[in-house]
Curated annotation (Swiss-Prot):
Lineage per the UniProt record: Eukaryota, Metazoa, Chordata, Craniata, Vertebrata
Region span, Disordered: 289-315, 424-450, 467-533, 618-691, 711-731, 968-1019
Gene name tied to this protein: NYNRIN
Domain of life: Eukaryota
Biased composition (Polar residues): 618-627
Descriptive protein name: Protein NYNRIN
Subcellular location(s) per record: Membrane
Species for this entry: Homo sapiens (Human)
Domain named RNase NYN: residues: 792-942
């Protein structure tokens, strides 16, 4: 969500309907809270049905709120969504935070119902976004936790801690359920909050983000704090000045409300126990502090005395001064201040409250780090460690003490970028009481005091049954540099003092380590933020006189003790333990009881706090030199000279001493071992089951010695350096490294503890001194100018990481960057880029040798990421996003030691994982590992090389295999739950692997080194089961003999490539001798074991040396072995030679040399163990193998293949690449199968369900030869033909294009133009020529011509110019400003000549004689004439020639006609498809078949038949047996079957012949073609439902009802459709982000269309152009996005076509899409297709359609309608959608059908008038056809919200059918464009305007 100050507030007004006003009023408060805008409603007039809403706030917030209100007032969808009830806490927990964030993100109206139910409403997009989010949430519920030691496990640990802190802050009764959710679910919820917070600081955002409570006051949630303080009740406690509390005026001022305050959970809000949440929201609590006069401002009844010998007199007097606080009755009473983070009540007793509403305490800013970056650097990490590392119900009931360093940042994990700890402005916290006692409050304020040592705030986590106090001790050690601001707890003190607070506590820690006394004794990981700590003790300076502020337990007991603050000057060498308890009697001083022990350690210069375990008591006696002992929780007694700590009642020890006179506080359970531990000697060793302890020496060695980070050490008086055993609940981590180890992995239970070491400090040379000395060594960046290695990757260097590592994490060493650049430059890299943020370039004492950066910047090798400094805060962009983006786009590697965790879970996860190159420095030596990705990964040289993408994928494929479900033989048998299949099969694979190992062991025991016949049989069956398909002409015996060692799983490694054919062996492998005998002998030859066997093998091979290529080279190693007869030794070299000879002979005998005239067939089989590929050709009906290969596949333990099911494409790609030498560019027919070895029983294998083998379809997608070349190969492979189409580049040209800027002074320039217009019901045409020649004056010519078409006029001008000026000695150039005629002469004329002057539908082109005449004229010239297209139509020559053309068309010139002696070209139109069988079509209709049978048998129809009323008019044709109908005064016509009726109407109504005429004219023409019952009504319904009659016939604001031409419950193709929008996906090169899937469930036809915008209009346009234009609106439309989405799509169709108002017919059905079974397989392949093709997926999408059509066993829609199949002569997959291809096939069929019907009706006509009408209809249909060269207008569908409009005119460049045309100039001007349906076209109007090309309207 936006920052409140990010954008200036703005206002926006919009209207909603009045009926929605109550709904808006109910949701007004929620809108203001979630979107942080102000919402007001205004009624304009009482009589208007609308009212105004005013939004005020940031613009982005207003935009979101507006969309939310639109969905609220006019919801498009309102539906219940179900989910697992376990996720119910995600919607109600955290006080509604996640629900509000989900509402912010999706803008949906969300109403949680019972567990497992959520009502979702709003706009369609909002509903879909919510539904998708819920699906992902439910999907993540099944994710199991990752192993702890894996990167994912480390990440999940971070997520769990962050989530725990968030739940802690927003705690309610659902907190326990939230914390039990899987880490993946928690991660998604955290990302939801992160996205909602946006760029705003998460802490500030949570402070302003209210609680989802319908009873809370909404105005408080949105008003600033100053607006909420209305008449505050000031309650001052203590003397002035001091901490004060401002309480907002309570709405209920009853005495009960004013007496008590209850703390609800860990909210930190002070509210009354009985006050309502609304009252609580109005309360304002402000806690301040004052440190003047050294006065303690919190004065309470009771006295406490303390003395110190080292303080000054005035301080002593001030501290010894007794203070008394007047009893406060009927007023608010406060306990001593407690940190808000210290409260840990049991969750079952957690009272929900307005946790952190508009005025949540600022101290929580230190408890929760920035969730949007997930950097665990703040105290919430400590908190989550303390309370969330074990189940919620098992958290410690005892107090948990934490420490927050005041001016120190917490230790950093090296895997994260360093972040500064946010200052703590304030802190509030209640201490939970069993009796609901009121809590305390403290203020954390920024009081930077450089002259005073940094403070450490000791925070306490105490359950609701404990009293809690807080303190600040000064001079506590810290690690790391201080911050600029120090949050301090202040409770008064001496002048200049920071103040201190005293609290009762169970655990104590000094330094930055938390103490967790748990009931189970488990050590809890605290992130390594502190030293070692021991619960039960608290250290304060020994010289202190520390009277502490005691606690007020109840309102009824106001007596308190008070302790003054410490003096400002405190020594750091001596510390004492101070433990306090609370007396029951108000005025009785505490009696001394058994003292506690204190452990100390010393060092000379660097000292560290050593925390110990002591009881919690209060000092009463000033000086006690001797040490006193008392039972403590597993604490050893200190030395005899250890300073004594005074002890009061051991309130927190489970077994308190009997001598304690003061009643103890409620007992707190501690570790049983701890409570029962006796006095342990100091030398006693620590038990191994205790938690890990602190290695102080390591801590000291790893802490950076800075001037500000001095560390103090407890100094004893004798036993210096001795350290006692630590509590099992203690965890201490020392440094950043330990933080990295245990902060992420957590502490292990039972981990061995390191023995304590004696601390000694020495004054050796530091690393910083060594670094500065190294800088004195000169270094120069010398980048040589020699060319580098072009095969190396780009290197992207993380400059900050390299510089900081070389600078010891303290200096930004630019020399380190230069060394890294020099290292890669020397290796040959010339593409090196260094990324450095801008602020590192500024002058800074930590930036060393910046001149290296200057030089790199001058060499264009330095990229500076933008950043800025505002108010001392660095605002920088994320450098790693730049690095990852550059590495992704350039295929480079990233040099960094960071793990880039933020990107590891994004789409770049795999890329980032495989591109990181770690490094280190050894002094001034830059070093990188030789195996960057591990010892199993590539070497450094391979890592730095540019990879071959295909080789990389193939390499990955050959190393991995996917485990298929045992029950399926192929991937296609996976059902919807296929994702769980591989997981379930993993145990089975382990069993198989174990059985395999057992079987191998048994075989080895039975006989090693011997081959038995039984084993050979097993191997044969194994091979048969692996390959499944019998290898053609390659017996398994031969294949087995080619492997030296028989693998137990049958995975052979064989490679047979064809060699030169042997002349004396005859035809290879003809099944006869000598081949059969040779192979039989060869199969028996095994590895020679002695000299005799080797000699026999050599003799055998020598007899066939003529058949083996390179025989001498192959046999060389074996010949040399023969010479070593006495002591010969068989080694690897001889094995390879032996195998090479056998393979060469088998290849010569079994393989045929490839024939380039025959197509190849490639069979690829992928089994669980091997990849087998066979390349063969068919000749004389037999398969002849060309090449063979078999490769074993290595198992992958993690089962991580390239992609799910993605192995097979890589297998085919590898086979094609492997056989490329044999294949070349010859077309290949691909076949792919997936073998399964789950069973060897052939009956079981045959009994399995035959799958559709979607992997077979995938095999068509991997030939990477370019789209056109691949198209040709696929065409030949699918059609089984061996005829290559002529490429366009090799076609002969008849004109040549004149280059631009040519000198026209040496040319005969012929300016030409044609003109055509309509006058007095007739066409007139003419052309003009204006000729300029360097040897003669200009010539002007005008001609008239016929036929009267614009294309003919232009062509006639060209022919006339060639006749008159073609024989000129000078070259001739034709100049025209008509783009159409230029494209015709240059591009189309050669293509038409190659086609035989036929269009794509097989019909003759217009004017073939004129085209042939022009070709003959150009071929007779010595050089081809030139053509040139002028760009300016208004030039003098263009205007002149246009005028001449008009004169010629008007009859003002000569008459030009084609010479009569020109031979006409032979044009042979061919019919596309076979003649339809009319009788078979009728018999395919069961109703007509029954009527024909009854007529043949002489029976009558039943009364229920639709033909019963017309039975007497039905008859059978005597010749053909066709069923005919004879109506009154009508000719006999054919009875049309049911499946063809709608398409027959289409052929009359929609094509140019019908031109969308009225129903009466359509019925009149259709009646000449056939008849069926109810025909006239059917025609009326069709014309009424025709969408494309709208732009022609719709008048004004007429309402258009969207109807379907299909009857209800129709099962015909295209009558029912299913649609789904998939995405967003990888953005294509054209900008497509989504994919529209359209499926016909009846025929299982599926198609996908790329989408740029995901809108109803975009989907409607695609459906209009590709589906509805040919097949009409379906009667049933199912959408995965919901019924409302489908309705909007159809309404958008009507609006896009020009209707003013569109409504939907009641007959249309919009059910919910319950099953995607029709296209789930296609959808799965689509995702992998996009993954495989990357950004080119949209352009390559036709490949996916073609692949699925090629091997689909389902009947196509065309086959369902006609009963047969049709093939197209041209490949149209790239230009047309599959729906239009099916329509094209249907158009061809209907054209043939109409011709057959006209011939049939003319033959059976009884009257001459009937025959004449038949011929007239045939002639008229031919005359009204559109031909190539005609001009038409196109209906351009709306763009950017505009309405549809007719644009043009455009020329028809080609005709595919009567309803599909290829348009020239649309959508790309001057190019042969897309294929357009005739329903979106109309003829250009007949007028006097010239029919010339117009640019497409924008």
């Amino acid at each position: 969500m936006l920052l409140s100050g990010g954008d200036p507030p703005a206002q926006e007004w919009f209207m909603v309907q009045t009926k929605s006003k109550p709904r808006v009023q109910r949701q007004r408060l929620q809108v203001q809270r979630i979107f942080r805008v102000k919402l007001n409603a205004f009624q304009s007039r009482p009589d208007t049905p609308y009212f105004w809403l005013q939004l005020e706030g940031p613009r982005e917030n207003m935009g979101k709120a507006k969309e939310y209100l639109k969905g609220l007032c006019s919801p498009e969808l309102w539906k219940e969504v179900r989910y697992p009830p376990i996720l119910h806490c995600a919607f109600l927990g955290a006080q509604g935070l996640f629900l509000d964030c989900l509402c912010w993100s999706t803008l949906a109206y969300l109403v949680p119902g019972p567990p497992g139910s959520l009502m979702v409403g709003g706009l369609t997009e909002s509903f879909i976004m919510t539904q998708n989010w819920l699906e992902e949430l439910v999907g993540r519920l099944r994710w199991g936790p990752a192993p702890l030691l894996t990167p994912r496990g480390i990440w999940e640990a971070e997520v769990t801690r962050a989530f725990g802190a968030l739940v802690w802050i927003r705690g309610d009764q659902h907190a326990g359920d939230l914390l039990q959710l899987p880490p993946a679910v928690q991660e998604l919820l955290l990302s939801l909050v992160r996205d909602a917070a946006g760029k705003e600081d998460i802490i500030e955002w949570l402070s302003r983000f209210g609680i989802s409570d319908s009873h809370s006051d909404p105005e408080v949630l949105i008003c600033p704090p100053q607006q909420q303080k209305e008449a505050p009740a000031m309650v001052s406690v203590g003397e002035s000045p001091g901490p004060f509390v401002d309480m907002g005026t309570l709405q209920n001022r009853g005495p009960e409300n004013s007496k008590r305050l209850s703390s609800l959970g860990a909210t930190g809000s002070l509210i009354t126990a009985q006050s309502t949440p609304q009252e609580a929201a109005n309360q304002l609590v402000r806690v301040g502090s004052n440190n003047q006069d050294g006065m303690d401002s919190a004065q309470e009844e009771g006295t406490v005395q303390a003395t110190s010998s080292q303080d000054s007199t005035n301080h002593t007097q001030a501290l010894l001064k007794q203070r008394q606080v007047q009893k406060i009755e009927d007023k608010l009473l406060f306990q001593p201040p407690v940190s808000a983070l210290g409260v840990c009540p049991p969750w079952k007793a957690w009272t929900p409250g307005p946790a952190f509403g508009p005025l949540w305490p600022g101290a929580i800013a230190a408890t929760f780090w920035r969730i949007n970056e997930l950097h665990s650097l703040h105290l919430a990490w400590l908190l989550s460690q303390a309370c969330f590392n074990f189940p919620f119900w098992q958290r410690p009931l005892g107090p948990i003490q934490l420490k927050l360093p005041g001016q120190n940042p917490l230790p950093l994990n090296l895997e994260w970028k360093q972040k500064e700890l946010a200052p703590l402005p304030s802190a509030e916290s209640p201490a939970g009481r069993p009796d609901g006692g009121l809590g305390g409050e403290a203020a954390l304020q920024n009081c930077p005091r450089p002259e005073i040592s940094p403070k450490v705030t000791s925070l306490l986590v105490v359950p609701g049954s404990s009293d809690v106090k807080d303190k600040v001790s000064s001079d506590l050690p810290q690690i790391g540099p201080p911050l600029t601001s120090t949050p301090q707890l202040q409770a008064g003190g001496e002048p200049g003092d920071q103040g201190s607070m005293q609290l009762d506590f169970k655990g104590l820690e000094e330094g930055p380590a938390p103490v967790l006394p748990t009931g189970q004794g488990k050590p809890v990981a605290q992130g390594g933020l502190t030293d070692q700590s021991v619960p039960g003790a608290q250290t304060v300076p020994e010289t202190l006189k520390v009277p502490m502020a005691a606690a007020v337990p109840k309102a009824e007991n106001p007596s308190r003790t008070q302790v003054p603050s410490a003096a400002p000057k405190l020594p750091t060498s001596r510390m004492m333990l101070a433990v306090h308890t609370e007396p029951a009697a108000p005025e009785v001083p505490l009696a001394p009881t058994k003292p506690t022990a204190q452990l100390m350690a010393t060092a000379q210069k660097t000292v560290v706090n050593q925390p110990v375990l002591v009881a919690q008591v209060e000092p009463t006696t000033p000086k006690t030199p001797q040490a006193q002992k008392m039972p403590v929780a597993k604490t050893s007694p200190a030395g005899p000279k250890t300073p004594k700590a005074q002890a009061g009642p051991a309130a927190t020890v489970s077994k308190a001493p009997a001598a304690s006179k003061a009643p103890a506080a409620p007992k707190v359970p501690v570790t049983p071992r701890v409570s029962r531990a006796p006095k342990t000697p100091a030398a006693q060793k620590v038990p191994t089951d205790a938690g890990p302890t602190l290695d102080v020496a390591r801590l000291l060695s790893e802490v950076q010695p800075t001037s500000r980070a001095s560390v103090s050490l407890l100094k004893g008086q004798g036993q210096a350096g001795r350290q006692g055993p630590q509590s099992s609940g203690t965890l201490a981590l020392s440094s950043k490294h330990q933080f990295q180890m245990e902060g992420l992995l957590g502490a292990w239970e039972g981990a061995p503890r390191q023995p304590p070491r004696h601390l000694q400090a020495n004054s050796t040379v530091t690393s910083f001194q060594r670094y500065h000395e190294a800088l004195n060594t000169p270094f120069e960046l010398n980048l040589s100018g020699e060319p580098g290695n072009q095969g190396l990757r780009r290197v992207v260097i993380d400059g900050s990481s390299v510089a900081m590592v070389h600078g010891l994490q303290h200096f930004f060493s630019c020399r380190g960057i230069a060394m890294a650049v020099q290292f890669f430059w020397n290796r040959g890299h010339r593409e090196v880029t260094v990324f450095v943020p801008t602020w590192q370039l500024k002058k800074n004492r930590r930036v060393r040798e910046s001149h290296f950066l200057t030089k790199l910047h001058s060499l264009k090798m330095l990229s500076i990421t933008p950043s800025q400094l505002e108010n001392g805060k660095k605002i920088t962009t994320y450098d790693y996003r730049f690095m990852v983006k550059l590495a992704e786009e350039t295929d480079g590697i990233i040099v960094t030691n960071e793990q880039i965790h933020i990107l590891m879970n994004s789409s770049k996860k795999l890329m980032v994982k495989d591109r990181l190159l770690p490094f280190t420095f050894a002094g001034n030596l830059f070093m990188v590992p030789d195996d960057p990705l591990g010892r199993d990964g590539p070497t450094l040289d391979e890592f730095l090389k540019k990879p071959n993408r295909l080789d990389t994928d193939i390499g990955n494929f050959l190393k991995v295999w996917k485990t298929l479900p045992p029950s399926s033989a192929s991937v296609t048998e996976l059902s919807d739950d296929a994702d769980s299949g591989p997981l379930e099969s993993l145990p089975n694979m382990e069993e198989v692997r174990e059985e395999k190992e057992e079987r191998q062991d048994e075989e080895q025991r039975q006989g090693q080194g011997t081959q038995k016949a039984a084993e050979e049989d097993d191997l044969d069956s194994s091979l048969a089961s692996v390959f499944r398909v019998e290898c053609p002409s390659l017996s398994e015996e031969i294949l087995r003999c080619l492997s030296l060692h028989d693998p137990p799983d049958g995975a052979l490694d064989i490679d047979l490539l064809p060699g030169a054919a042997s002349p004396y062996l005859g035809i290879p492998w003809d099944g006869k001798a000598p081949c059969q005998q040779v192979l039989a002998h060869l199969a028996q030859l095994t590895i020679p074991s002695n000299f005799t066997a080797l000699s026999f093998f050599m003799g055998f091979m020598d007899s066939h040396r003529d058949a083996i290529p390179d025989y001498e080279a192959l046999v060389g190693p074996l010949h040399s072995l023969l010479k070593q007869k006495p002591d010969w030794q068989w080694d690897q070299e001889h094995e390879e030679a032996f195998l090479a000879l056998k393979r060469a002979l088998v290849s010569a005998l079994c393989l045929m040399a490839p024939n380039s005239q025959l197509p190849f067939r490639l069979e690829v089989t992928v089994s669980h163990v091997a990849l087998t590929a066979i390349l063969h050709q068919e000749h004389s009906g037999r398969k002849h193998p060309i090449a063979y290969t078999s490769k074993p596949l290595l198992p992958d333990e993690e089962s991580q293949g390239p992609q799910s099911g993605g192995d097979s494409p890589y297998a085919v790609a590898w086979a094609l690449k492997h056989f490329s030498r044999c294949i070349g560019d010859t077309p290949v027919v691909l076949d792919l199968s997936y073998a399964s070895r789950t069973t060897a029983d052939p009956e079981v294998r045959e009994g399995r369900r035959v799958s559709k083998a979607w992997l077979i379809r995938w095999s068509l997608l991997v030939q990477d030869k370019g789209k056109r070349a691949l198209e040709l190969a696929l065409l030949q492979g699918l059609l089984g033909e061996n005829r290559l189409l002529t490429p366009a580049a090799s076609m002969p040209r008849f004109f040549q294009v004149l280059p631009p800027f040519s000198d026209l002074s040496t040319f005969v320039c012929i300016h030409m133009s044609g003109y055509c217009f309509y006058r007095e019901d007739e066409w007139c045409a003419g052309f003009g020529l204006y000729v300029l020649s360097p040897t003669s004056p200009p010539v002007s010519l005008s001609f008239s011509c016929s036929p009267y078409t614009p294309t003919y006029a232009h062509l006639a001008a060209v022919a006339c110019g060639l006749e008159r000026f073609g024989q000129s000695p000078l070259p001739v150039v034709f100049l025209t400003h008509c783009n159409w005629i230029f494209s015709l002469l240059w591009e189309l004329l050669p293509l038409w000549r190659a086609r035989g002057f036929l269009s794509s539908d097989g019909a003759p082109l217009p004017h073939p004689s004129l085209l042939s005449y022009i070709i003959s004229l150009t071929s007779g010239l010595s050089s081809l004439p030139f053509i040139y297209r002028t760009s300016y139509r208004g030039s003098l020559f263009a205007v002149t020639v246009d005028t001449l053309a008009k004169q010629g068309a008007q009859g003002g010139g000569q008459w030009w006609s084609l010479p009569k002696d020109v031979p006409a070209p032979t044009v042979s139109p061919h019919a596309m498809g076979k003649r339809p069988n009319l009788l078979a079509l009728q018999l395919s209709d069961s109703t007509l078949a029954d009527i024909i049978a009854r007529l043949q048998a002489g029976q009558k129809l039943s009364g229920s038949s639709p033909f019963s009323s017309a039975f007497n008019s039905l008859s059978l044709d005597k010749e053909s047996g066709l069923l005919m109908f004879k109506g009154d005064k009508k000719p006999r016509v054919w009875v049309v079957p049911t499946q063809l009726r709608r398409d027959l109407i289409f052929s009359v109504h929609d094509i140019p012949l019908g031109a969308h005429q009225r129903p009466e004219e359509t019925y009149k023409k259709l009646r000449l073609l056939g008849w069926w019952p109810g025909m006239q009504e059917h025609v009326k319904d069709y014309c009424r439902s025709c969408l494309f009659c709208i732009p022609r016939n719709l008048i004004g604001s007429e309402l258009k009802v969207i109807e379907s031409p299909w009857p209800l419950r129709s099962t015909a193709p295209w009558s029912n459709l299913q649609i789904e929008v998939v995405g967003p996906v990888t953005i294509s090169e054209e900008g497509h982000k989504h994919v529209l899937i359209v499926a016909d469930p009846n025929t299982r036809w599926v198609e996908a269309f790329p989408l740029k915008p995901y809108t109803h209009t975009a989907v409607a346009q695609v459906l209009l152009q590709h589906v509805f234009a040919r097949w009409g609106v379906p009667v049933r439309l199912e959408a995965a996005q919901g019924p409302q989405f489908a309705r909007h799509v159809l309404v958008s169709c009507g609006l896009a076509l020009g209707a003013q108002v569109a409504s939907l017919s009641r007959d249309l059905q919009f059910p919910c899409l319950t099953s995607s079974g029709a296209y789930w397989e296609f959808k799965r392949a689509l995702k992998e297709f996009i993954f495989l093709h990357g950004k080119k997926w949209a352009a390559s999408l036709p490949l996916l359609h073609l692949a699925f059509r090629a091997s689909s066993t389902d009947a196509t829609p065309f086959k369902v309608l006609t009963g047969g199949e049709s093939r197209l002569t041209e490949p149209l997959w790239w230009e047309m959608s599959s729906a239009n291809i099916e329509g094209l096939k249907m158009d061809v069929f209907l054209l043939q059908l109409v011709g057959e019907l006209l011939e049939l009706h003319w033959r059976v006509a009884d009257k001459a008038s009937e025959k004449a009408e038949n011929r007239r209809f045939k002639r008229e249909s031919q005359e009204k056809e559109w031909n190539v060269g005609d001009q038409v207008l196109l209906l351009s569908l709306p763009r950017n919200g505009s309405s549809a409009k007719w644009v043009g005119p455009f020329y028809i460049g080609d005709r595919l059918s009567l309803s599909l045309y290829r348009i020239w100039g649309f959508p790309t001007p001057e190019k042969l464009g897309c294929i357009y349906p005739s329903s979106l076209m109309k003829a250009f109007a007949k007028s006097g305007t010239p029919l010339s090309f117009k640019v497409l309207e924008q």
